[in-house]
Amino acid sequence: MSERKQQIARHFGAAAPTYDRAARIQARIAVELANAIAAITQPAMILEFGCGTGNLTRALLGHFPDARLVATDLAPPMAAFCRKRVDAGARLLSAGMDGELPAFAMGKFDLVCGSLAAQWFSHPHQAFAALGALLRPGGVLALTTLGTDTFQEWRAAAALLGLSPAIPVYPSLAELDWQRPPGFLVERAEEQRLWDEHPNALDFLQSLRSIGADLPADHARPLSAGALRRILRQVDAQGHVRATYHVLTVLWRRR
């Protein structure tokens, strides 16, 4: 596992006990993805990547009472937390797994899915191809990820100060579709913007830390403490602190 992947796993593993208290937006997005999946397919075998504490896991098992689900996460503590939190008996298995290197037989699953996990992939195009290969013909690859306008308030505040925040560059919906594996049809592709309200900018940063998502972009230089304080003051000066989540949702069906 690369140093970057180890870093991601450590951050999310450490956040397992605090994740649910701060993950309001993430929980909503997971439920909406499960609803979208249930509208187009009835899977018997499901693989979930980036399961976290189990928001999508629980929603899927509620929709599909006869399905079996394998919940995986790059951070083994997250996968273990999911298994304990979601009471599904033998219907649910959990394991540590890098979603970019899936360790299952090809053609095994009816549904492969993940909510707000793909933005952590180093090579999403290759990852989607590898995950798609695990599907039977007619199976669905479904995911949500972050889009271009995510945390735009933070970017704007930094730009006013001549600073570059270490926020990843996220794709547009069209750019995400360019990463669709060959042989897959678009069942659904949409975007929405959700807003996470905070009393101040520091509370926003602390919420990211609580869910393990406070890592800078890969190869980006973190802001100095002084620069970070300047951005915090700039955001607070706007008088209304909110964080935009630009959410991309795609459901692709294998021919």
Language-model features: locations:
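Conserved alpha-helix/loop element of class I SAM-dependent methyltransferases that forms part
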Residues: 24-43
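Class I SAM-dependent methyltransferase SAM/SAH-binding core
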Residues: 47-102
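Conserved Class I S-adenosyl-L-methionine
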Residues: 53-55, 186-255
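Conserved catalytic/acceptor-binding region of the Class I
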Residues: 140-200, 214-222
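A short acidic, Gly/Pro-enriched loop at the edge of an enzyme's catalytic core
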Residues: 100-112
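N-terminal, positively charged/glycine-rich alpha-helical extensions of SAM-dependent methyltransferases
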Residues: 1-15
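A short glycine-rich, Lys/Arg-flanked "PGG" loop and its adjoining helix->strand segment in the class I
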Residues: 125-137
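A short SAM/SAH-binding and catalytic strip from SAM-dependent methyltransferases
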Residues: 111-123
